Curated annotation (Swiss-Prot):
GO terms for molecular function: structural constituent of ribosome. NCBIfam families: rpmH_bact. This is Large ribosomal subunit protein bL34. Signal peptide: none annotated. Residues 1-44 are annotated as: Disordered. The keyword Ion transport does not apply. GO terms for cellular component: ribonucleoprotein complex; ribosome. The keyword Cytoplasm does not apply. PANTHER family: LARGE RIBOSOMAL SUBUNIT PROTEIN BL34M, MITOCHONDRIAL RIBOSOMAL PROTEIN 34 FAMILY MEMBER. The gene is rpmH.
Amino acid sequence: MKRTYQPSRIKRKRTHGFLARKKTTGGRRVLKNRRRKGRWRLTV
């Protein structure tokens, strides 16, 4: 059986990266909330 997690650096960056977050309204909200919470890392 094929597992669900098939690591790929490119895919990881494209879906969860900083620029990907910056593009959408929801993503910007994510960044804002993580900044407010004081997360050490904003994105992957």
